């Protein structure tokens, strides 16, 4: 199977919206190449510099590379994406550019690894590719070894970083955690590293469940985390202290009431994957259901919300 790489250059202001469009239309991964990275490329903390090549980055704005199964990427899908992006309110037509190419499966399986290096995702957590060697800076640093596979994120997206920071703040070792839409399993692994004993990782995609299980094994926690296919929380009967969901906003909106019902009293709902334009809508529904909003964090057009269940 081959992949169609759809490359879209846009102004920075609309990057989260375009990412959301691509994910909604079924992209199997999005690579972000930001022109600002050429200006702000410090020596990294691992003792070497990953030098960025100017020719790999747009002159202005952000290049988003989205990957679609070639057999599913037809004229209809192409036109829907172009129309949705072109019609965005704050799109800069002087920056906007579309291009595409076909990438063979064997090339893509390794190509995405060029973008993935060890990085500090939060105060405590460092994400380390499974194929790289890394030495911790100090004993307090917690390393998550990750091989996300081509269809899942590497943990460097703002939504993941904000979720990890929320986990550091709100998750205790005596809590129970359910991770909805686990993907690569990174948030479940983080919970395990904090000492959580009961963790359940759900994903509607069986491929995601398998990738998560492989990453659990890499982090020596495969026996500590239950990873199963599941359709959000619709059939969940067990109660948990923490519900985590880093997924798309419209899916989060549909599961807010189920999240509330799944939580024990005083439990927390940690959720991200929400673009700025939709966060008030999500906030309002969470409050209407009964959540006490504990924090709302913003990062590069994305939002992470934490709500607490304060009564049964």
From Swiss-Prot:
Localization: Cytoplasm
Lipid biosynthesis in keyword set: no
HAMAP family: Methyltr_PrmA
Gene: prmA
Key words of the record: Cytoplasm, Methyltransferase, S-adenosyl-L-methionine, Transferase
Protein name: Ribosomal protein L11 methyltransferase
One Pfam assignment: PrmA
Similarity-based family: Belongs to the methyltransferase superfamily. PrmA family.
Enzyme Commission code(s) on record: 2.1.1.-
Record InterPro entries: Ribosomal_L11_MeTrfase_PrmA, Ribosomal_PrmA_MeTrfase, SAM-dependent_MTases_sf
Any Gene Ontology CC annotation: cytoplasm
Residues that bind S-adenosyl-L-methionine: 160, 181, 203, 246
Gene Ontology annotations of biological process type: methylation
Catalyzed reactions per annotation: L-lysyl-[protein] + 3 S-adenosyl-L-methionine = N(6),N(6),N(6)-trimethyl-L-lysyl-[protein] + 3 S-adenosyl-L-homocysteine + 3 H(+)
